[in-house]
């Protein structure tokens, strides 16, 4: 079973983050059941809104999301980083253009189906 652990931020941000991550797992990686995703909602000092890093194997991931983002941008950023999770989990090349292309589509689908 996939595990998602979220720390930092406010309770409503953690709840939103969990919901978006579980939604994107269903959309992007429906067959995987052994993902371990650790998310930290934190202040990111540069112009980036989020980061995704692979852990010890291609099933363990660390994501940082800027907690200062508004909800719309937070959902977009989470969707973007989850595309990178998909790329790493499937041993695909991490292509930024794919993440940028899929993030608005995933975010819109999330808002329409989950809210």
How should each PLM-predicted stretch be described?
Residues 1-12, 37-47:
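Hydrophobic or amphipathic, alpha-helical segments that drive membrane association/targeting
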Residues 12-35:
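Zn2+-dependent metallopeptidase catalytic core
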Residues 76-88:
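Active-site recognition of the HExxH zinc-binding catalytic motif
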Residues 72, 76, 100:
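Membrane-embedded glycan transfer/ligation machinery
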Residues 4-6, 59-65:
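Short, aliphatic-rich beta-strand segments
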Residues 40-62, 71:
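Catalytic zinc-binding patch centered on the HExxH motif and its immediate surroundings
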Residues 90-115:
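Post-HExxH zinc-binding segment in Zn-dependent metallohydrolases
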Residues 15, 72-73, 93:
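Soluble non-cytosolic domains of exported or imported proteins
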């Amino acid at each position: 079973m996939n595990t998602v652990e979220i720390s930092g931020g406010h309770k409503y941000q953690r709840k939103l983050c969990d919901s978006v991550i579980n939604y994107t797992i269903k959309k992007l990686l429906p067959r995987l059941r052994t993902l371990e995703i650790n998310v930290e909602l934190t202040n990111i000092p540069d112009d980036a809104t989020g980061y995704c890093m692979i852990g010890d194997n291609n099933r363990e991931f660390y994501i940082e999301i800027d907690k200062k983002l508004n909800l719309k941008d937070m959902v977009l950023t989470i969707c973007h980083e989850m595309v990178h999770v998909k790329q790493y989990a499937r041993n695909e090349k991490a292509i930024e253009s794919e993440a940028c292309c899929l993030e608005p589509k995933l975010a819109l689908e999330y808002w329409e189906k989950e809210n």
